[in-house]
Amino acid sequence: MKFGIEFVPSDPALKIAYYAKLSEQQGFDHVWITDHYNNRDVYSTLTVLALNTNSIKIGPGVTNSYTRNPAITASSIASIAEISGGRAVLGLGPGDKATFDAMGIAWKKPLATTKEAIQAIRDFISGKKVSMDGEMIKFAGAKLAFKAGNIPIYMGAQGPKMLELAGEIADGVLINASHPKDFEVAVEQIKKGAEKAGRDPSEVDVTAYACFSIDKDPVKAVNAAKVVVAFIVAGSPDLVLERHGIPVEAKSQIGAAIAKGDFGALMGGLVTPQMIEAFSICGTPDDCMKRIKDLEAIGVTQIVAGSPIGPAKEKAIKLIGKEIIAKM
């Protein structure tokens, strides 16, 4: 099992670099930095991380091909690979409609866009001149002036078609899920895609990009996770809620509380233990270890400790290192 950790660059880059270095010291394999227009720039942050770490792999988790042209993404991640001494990985997905609506960007044909973007980026970083007349991505003889070599590309994927595509073309897949029930479904779709492409499914790094909250006090861990879990519930398809026995109407209730900024309601009971169980890896080190082993048994090969990580971030990173990574 590999371990990754997610940081949101809402904090200054040097603070993120401190946490990344600490994560490296605790045995984490990957640091993933989110890419969103309202935070610090992902590639500027990754540059600071590259200069302040030695061995941990680093990359965006995840970027997209709507706000960033694939040629620009290729140039950016190739630069990170060069600065870091070959430690770059690229997480790329379809993005989310709400963000694109806020930015005035049309979200068209995410499956075709993601597939064509990955092909173009691979060609760019291998030094090829790219001529592409795709359904969504088009180039007319564009070429980078330097070659990066091999950079693993992970697809952010949720739905069945995206998961199948990841099995066909990606080195890894980043799945926003925490529960074995969701991975039973996801792993089968990834296998289907891999077999379609004539690949061994074991070539694909199946990653649980999870809401993670760890503390020796389970109540503190749960309370730290509630707001993140609320956003997950509010954005989950009805099918996923039903899979976990969560009433579909809870989505609108939680969505309304989020819209009003009523976080007291979320903390006070709207976010139920059932939701915490379904949408997070949460609790004491023993609780988290049990869930990780259950996910490993299904076929998950990397756990990403996503927001909030724990009620106290530095303490949580050390706890994961000492009580989970060291014992795996």
UniProtKB/Swiss-Prot annotation:
Q: Might you name a Gene Ontology BP term for this protein?
A: one-carbon metabolic process
* Catalytic reactions of this protein: 5-methyl-5,6,7,8-tetrahydromethanopterin + oxidized coenzyme F420-(gamma-L-Glu)(n) + H(+) = 5,10-methylenetetrahydromethanopterin + reduced coenzyme F420-(gamma-L-Glu)(n)
User: What domain of life?
Assistant: Archaea
Molecular function per GO? coenzyme F420-dependent N5,N10-methenyltetrahydromethanopterin reductase activity; oxidoreductase activity, acting on paired donors, with incorporation or reduction of molecular oxygen
Report the pathway entry. One-carbon metabolism; methanogenesis from CO(2); methyl-coenzyme M from 5,10-methylene-5,6,7,8-tetrahydromethanopterin: step 1/2
- Is-annotated flag, keyword Magnesium? no
Subcellular localization, as worded in the UniProt entry = Cytoplasm
For whether the record's keyword set contains Cell inner membrane, the answer is no
Q: Which SUPFAM superfamilies does the record match to this protein? A: Bacterial luciferase-like
Q: Taking the first listed entry, what is the main subcellular location of this protein, grouped into a coarse class?
A: cytoplasm
Q: Name one GO cellular component term.
A: cytoplasm
* One protein family per Pfam: Bac_luciferase
Q: What class of enzyme is it?
A: oxidoreductase
Enzyme Commission number: 1.5.98.2
Q: Which UniProt keywords apply?
A: Cytoplasm, Methanogenesis, One-carbon metabolism, Oxidoreductase
UniProt similarity note:
Belongs to the mer family.
Say what the protein does: Catalyzes the reversible reduction of methylene-H(4)MPT to methyl-H(4)MPT.
Name assigned to this protein = 5,10-methylenetetrahydromethanopterin reductase
The organism's lineage is:
Archaea, Methanobacteriati, Methanobacteriota, Stenosarchaea group, Methanomicrobia
- Which gene underlies this protein? mer
